[in-house]
């Protein structure tokens, strides 16, 4: 489990698990600090995909099915023992959705809450822009990464780091487009769902996520760009909001 799931704090007496999914090209580093930031009733786990961090010598996943199966194998026992919630940012939202579908279809499990951050809903017209990423030149991709934020500027000045970042980003995009997004079922879930986005980002399309559940839904626009969650005040809001949602759920 340790290579797939980062979980510095075990918290055996916690009442609920929060599984966090990083963005495309990302790693565990941002969400690791959430492991300590949440109250003792919540134990945080962060997904670590192959091809990065301590798994940088492993081959990248071939498709979403491989990603979902690996995460399921690592987490299933834990998820069967305690209620769980999912938080994904950008690409991580899509991975968390695919995992949620798999868990419900194959194991009859459903999260108490799904939190989607900085991502287009799969039913939105903007989602299909993701399929055009392979056509974008590396120089333009680097400009986009710089504009979106989330990556220290000094990293983008390092040729070796940028080369690896671009490869991870492209590999994650390859995984994303292998999923049958045309078959996304409306009202498939009954849990509550919340979407978050940065107010400076255009064309969110996050309203399309609302269609996947019959539970209560909310959308929040927080100050900032795609990586609004890195702003300390926004991060504090997210932690408090997620905690409140979990505390108010049927756990």
Swiss-Prot record:
Gene Ontology annotations of biological process type: fatty acid biosynthetic process
Catalysed reaction equations from the record: (9Z)-octadecenoyl-[ACP] + H2O = (9Z)-octadecenoate + holo-[ACP] + H(+)
EC code(s) of this entry: 3.1.2.14
Pfam families: Thioesterase
Active-site residues per Swiss-Prot or TrEMBL entry: 90, 226
Family that this chain belongs to: Belongs to the thioesterase family.
Protein name per its UniProtKB record: S-acyl fatty acid synthase thioesterase, medium chain
Native source species: Anas platyrhynchos
SUPFAM superfamilies the record matches: alpha/beta-Hydrolases
Cystine pairs: none
An annotated Gene Ontology molecular function: fatty acyl-[ACP] hydrolase activity
Alphabetical UniProt keywords: Fatty acid biosynthesis, Fatty acid metabolism, Hydrolase, Lipid biosynthesis, Lipid metabolism
Physiological role: In fatty acid biosynthesis chain termination and release of the free fatty acid product is achieved by hydrolysis of the thio ester by a thioesterase I, a component of the fatty acid synthetase complex. The chain length of the released fatty acid is usually C16. However, in the mammary glands of non-ruminant mammals, and in the uropygial gland of certain waterfowl there exists a second thioesterase which releases medium-chain length fatty acids (C8 to C2).
């Amino acid at each position: 489990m340790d290579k797939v799931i980062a979980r510095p704090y075990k918290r055996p007496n916690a009442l609920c698990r929060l599984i966090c999914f990083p963005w495309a090209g990302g790693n565990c580093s941002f969400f690791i600090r959430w492991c300590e930031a949440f109250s003792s009733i919540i134990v945080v786990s962060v997904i670590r995909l192959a091809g990065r961090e301590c798994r940088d010598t492993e081959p990248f996943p071939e498709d979403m099915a491989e990603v979902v199966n690996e995460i399921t194998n690592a987490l299933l026992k834990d998820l069967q023992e305690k209620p769980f919630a999912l938080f994904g940012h950008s690409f991580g939202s899509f991975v968390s959705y695919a995992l949620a579908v798999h868990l419900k279809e194959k194991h009859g499990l459903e999260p108490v809450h799904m939190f989607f951050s900085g991502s287009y809903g799969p039913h939105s017209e903007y989602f299909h822009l993701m399929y055009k990423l392979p056509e974008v030149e590396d120089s333009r991709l680097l400009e986009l990464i710089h504009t979106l934020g989330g990556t220290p500027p000094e990293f983008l000045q390092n040729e070796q780091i940028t080369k690896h970042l671009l490869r991870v980003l492209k590999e994650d995009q390859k995984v994303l487009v292998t999923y049958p997004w045309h078959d996304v079922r409306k009202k498939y879930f009954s849990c509550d769902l919340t979407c978050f986005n940065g107010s400076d980002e255009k064309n969110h399309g996050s309203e399309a996520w609302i269609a996947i559940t019959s539970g209560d839904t909310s959308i929040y626009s927080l100050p900032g760009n795609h990586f609004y969650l890195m702003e300390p005040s926004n991060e504090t809001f997210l932690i408090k909001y997620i905690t409140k949602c979990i505390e108010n759920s049927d756990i």
